From Swiss-Prot:
Residue numbers binding Mg(2+) 2: 36, 150
Binding residues annotated for Zn(2+), in chain numbering: 269, 280, 282
GO molecular function: 3,4-dihydroxy-2-butanone-4-phosphate synthase activity; GTP binding; GTP cyclohydrolase II activity; magnesium ion binding; manganese ion binding; zinc ion binding
Organism: Corynebacterium ammoniagenes
InterPro entries given in the database record: DHBP_synth_RibB-like_a/b_dom, DHBP_synthase_RibB, GTP_cyclohydro_II, RibA, RibA-like_sf, Riboflavin_synth_RibBA
SUPFAM superfamilies: RibA-like (SSF142695), YrdC/RibB (SSF55821)
EC number: 4.1.99.12, 3.5.4.25
Record's protein name: Riboflavin biosynthesis protein RibBA
Cofactor: Mg(2+); Mn(2+); Zn(2+)
Organism placement in taxonomy: Bacteria, Bacillati, Actinomycetota, Actinomycetes, Mycobacteriales
């Protein structure tokens, strides 16, 4: 049985993969074990050669696809293969095609010609016959940041290599067991044997988040609050449309180049922030952070939308509460729904801090690992300042779980337990 893909398998850098794509080579791209758990050979369609296609056919399923942007599918009149897409992964297969200059259409030479035509911005509908032996795929316009599939990875790699956004892909078959697909260590051995770079879609997602800007500052205004006056900056994510807010104390311009700035990265919590729920300490942490920042005279509150329930959404969080009422803890209540323990990611916060220009942050958080992802955005987490909120009878179990299973720094839990053990 093939081992699943995991972090123990050595991966190459995204920069190396981009360089090889630009040089006309293929790379191996793997996805998550919870998805297809497969590796695809991928190269740029505009650099297709009979030799590349023959290599791909030899080591793959042979069902070769060419991801294209939706506008190219429309330009070439490539409608969906089916009116209703029932593919479990949502892969957008279109009608199959051959270049009209080929012979049988199935040879490596003929398929390479079809790929070149599909990648050519000057090609037209009549350059192809239908049906054929090459399967175009309609990729999501925003690549792996919109859908974490090989289709989008192929488009992104070609674009990042400075080439037309059109790729070629096919799943690699196991040589150890040709009845199944290659996975994990076998993909690494295959890559090394053939001098190919191997990367993951997860790597590509993180690379794009760190090296591109998806959030834009759209508005600035003054916001007087019960805790003092802040400058409110509105940010909008250009891909998912989510709107986020940064509250600034001490002036926006003064943050550029500033060090050891108090920063609270706060995840949206309707129940805690607005309804003052006693099941969590979110609203109290937010308010205490605003007080700390006002007392310091400088600081940033980043309010991240879309983080409700550690990223699982409001209704799923309410369902998790119901499961907790039945005896599960906050972690298992998520897992019981088939949801991750914590679905949040903080690239938006990193991009906002990069936009503001601070050099280092004193993070107001009880999570000692929260600053690990900021370094990639040019911000050092120079210190962590706990935000200690005294427990109550309704949230003590929740806080114990955060301490014991999520490694949060919560000394107040021990104080509560000691005090109540004496009663």
């Amino acid at each position: 049985m093939n081992a699943p893909l995991n972090s123990a398998v050595r991966l190459d850098s995204i920069e190396e993969a981009i360089a090889d794509i630009a040089a006309g080579k293929a790379v191996v791209v793997v996805d998550n074990e919870d998805r297809e758990n497969e590796g695809d050979l991928i190269f740029a369609a505009e650099l297709a050669t009979p030799e590349l296609v023959a290599f791909m056919v030899r080591y793959s399923s042979g069902y070769i696809c060419v991801p294209l942007l939706p506008e190219d599918c429309k330009r070439l009149n490539l409608p969906p293969m089916m009116g209703r897409n029932e593919d479990v992964r949502g892969t957008a297969y279109t009608v199959t095609v051959d270049a009209n200059t080929g012979t049988t259409g199935i040879s490596a030479t003929s398929r390479a010609e079809t790929m070149l035509r599909l990648a050519d911005p000057m090609s037209v509908v009549d350059d192809f016959t239908r049906p054929g032996h090459v399967v175009p795929l309609a990729a999501r316009p925003n690549g792996v940041l919109e859908r974490d599939g090989h289709t989008e990875a192929a488009i992104d790699l070609a674009r990042l290599a400075g080439l037309r956004p059109a790729g070629v892909l096919c799943e690699i078959v196991s040589e150890e067991d040709p009845t199944t697909m290659a996975r994990s260590e076998e993909l690494r051995r295959f890559s090394d044997e053939h001098d190919l770079k191997m990367i993951s879609i997860e790597q590509l997602i993180e690379w794009r988040r760190h090296n591109e800007t998806q959030v834009r500052r759209t508005v600035e205004t003054q916001l007087p609050t019960d805790f003092g006056s802040f400058t409110a900056l509105g940010y909008k994510h250009e891909i998912d449309g989510q709107e986020h807010v940064a509250l600034i104390a001490g002036g926006v311009e003064e943050l550029n180049g500033a060090e050891d700035v108090f920063v609270r990265v706060h995840s949206e919590c309707l129940t805690g922030d607005v309804f003052h729920s006693r099941r969590c300490d979110c609203g109290q942490q937010l308010h205490q952070s605003m007080e700390i920042i006002q007392e310091a005279g400088q600081g940033i509150i980043i309010y991240l939308r879309g983080h409700e329930g550690r990223g699982i959404g409001l209704l799923a969080k309410l369902k998790a509460y119901s499961l907790q009422d039945s005896g599960l803890d906050t972690v298992d209540a998520n897992l019981e729904q088939g949801l991750p323990e914590d679905a949040r990611e903080y690239s938006v916060a990193g991009q906002i801090l990069r936009d503001l220009g601070i050099k280092s942050a004193n993070l107001l958080t009880n999570n000692p690992h929260k600053g690990e992802g900021l370094r990639g955005f040019g911000v050092e987490a120079s210190a962590h300042t706990p935000v200690e909120i005294e427990p109550n009878a309704d949230n003590i179990d929740y806080l114990r779980t955060k301490r014991d299973r999520m490694n949060h720094d919560l000394p107040q839990v021990a104080r509560w337990d000691a005090a109540h053990a004496l009663k």
